[in-house]
Amino acid sequence: MFLRRFAGPLLGKVKETTGLVGLDVVPNAREVLISLYNDTLKAVETIPSSAEYRKAVEKFTKFRLQVCEEEKDWEKIEERINGGQVEELIVMAKDELMLIDKMKG
């Protein structure tokens, strides 16, 4: 009884499903996003600083990284970024990294 009453609120919320076919829950989504956003900012430095694409990517990636660093709760991250579920944000960040590679070449 003690654990349910007092420890329950201390535990982080656990997402059981994304509700999207083929998109599994990522239990450490915040950490994955922080890593991907840092990788994106590093990768986009290879694009000329005058390129509008680079400016846009840096702007939204810095914002999303800031949100992930400020918020510990995945629901708050989803709410503030307003770009879908954290798992969808991971897919988008991976896609952006692939696009940066294509933009370089």
Cite the ranges covered by each PLM segment.
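N-terminal organelle transit peptides
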Residues: 1-51, 82-84, 98, 105
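Hydrophobic/aromatic-rich, well-ordered segments within soluble, folded domains that form packed cores
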Residues: 37-39, 49-74
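Short amphipathic alpha-helical coiled-coil/interface segments
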Residues: 61-65, 90-97
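Amphipathic alpha-helical coiled-coil segments
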Residues: 68-72, 99-104
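Short, charged early-sequence alpha-helical segments and their helix-coil boundaries
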Residues: 69-94
